[in-house]
């Protein structure tokens, strides 16, 4: 799934040696499946790991964690180390980061859900400076949403998603089986809570 060159492994181990014990690496994709997709790597401590949704890839002396929804976008990824006149940097090449596989009947259901999010959900989220957008729908009826603004990094996002948005979507669209969040959450001043 993910290949890391020997030089990149040594470099990552060196970087991790300067962090707290138990720190690993998280790989993510912002705006996956769009022309704006960007891959990234970040430090990941044990408290940041979601055992239910994160997939672990073990390497010598460290692990790499990827949210299960990001796996298709990071298929055949290569992490390498590049040295040039400006210094050394890690590169992450992900050939599928910008590719989105749309499911059957996506267009009709997509439009209905987008309209519902725009008229029923986003007006409430906008009160907190946030919004949500439809990201994808699978053949099995799983809806993927991406949060932004005040919702990104908000500590209440799981409750908002599961107790609010998911219940309303399933009630209004019986073909939906569940709703998942694909947002790469970063807490900050922009976050509502």
UniProtKB/Swiss-Prot annotation:
The keyword Metal-binding applies. It comes from Buchnera aphidicola subsp. Cinara cedri (strain Cc). [4Fe-4S] cluster binds at residues 151, 154. It comes from the Bacteria. Binds 1 [4Fe-4S] cluster per subunit. The cluster is presumably bound at the interface of two monomers. This is Fe/S biogenesis protein NfuA. GO terms for biological process: iron-sulfur cluster assembly; protein maturation. GO terms for molecular function: 4 iron, 4 sulfur cluster binding; iron ion binding. InterPro entries: Fe/S_biogenesis_protein_NfuA (IPR017726), FeS_biogenesis (IPR000361), FSCA_dom_sf (IPR034904), HesB-like_dom_sf (IPR035903), NIF_FeS_clus_asmbl_NifU_C (IPR001075). Its cofactor is [4Fe-4S] cluster. Belongs to the NfuA family. It holds the Pfam family NifU. Homodimer. Involved in iron-sulfur cluster biogenesis. Binds a 4Fe-4S cluster, can transfer this cluster to apoproteins, and thereby intervenes in the maturation of Fe/S proteins. Could also act as a scaffold/chaperone for damaged Fe/S proteins. Keywords: 4Fe-4S, Iron, Iron-sulfur, Metal-binding.
């Amino acid at each position: 799934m993910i290949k890391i060159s020997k030089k990149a492994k040594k470099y990552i181990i060196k970087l991790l040696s300067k962090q707290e014990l138990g720190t690993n690496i998280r790989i993510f994709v912002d705006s996956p499946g769009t022309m704006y997709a960007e891959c990234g790597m970040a430090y990941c401590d044990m408290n940041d790991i979601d055992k239910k949704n994160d997939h672990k890839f073990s390497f010598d002396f460290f692990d790499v964690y990827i949210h299960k929804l990001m796996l298709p976008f990071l298929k055949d990824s290569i992490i390498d180390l590049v040295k040039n006149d400006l210094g050394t940097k890690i590169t992450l090449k992900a050939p599928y980061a910008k590719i989105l596989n749309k499911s059957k009947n996506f267009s009709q259901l997509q439009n209905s859900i987008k309209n519902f999010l725009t008229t029923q959900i986003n007006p409430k989220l906008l009160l907190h400076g946030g919004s949500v957008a439809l990201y994808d729908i699978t053949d099995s009826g799983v809806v993927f949403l991406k949060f932004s603004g005040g919702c990104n990094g908000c500590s209440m996002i799981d409750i908002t998603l599961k107790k609010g948005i998911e219940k309303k979507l399933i009630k209004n669209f019986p073909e939906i089986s569940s709703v998942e969040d694909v947002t790469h959450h970063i807490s900050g001043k922009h976050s509502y809570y």
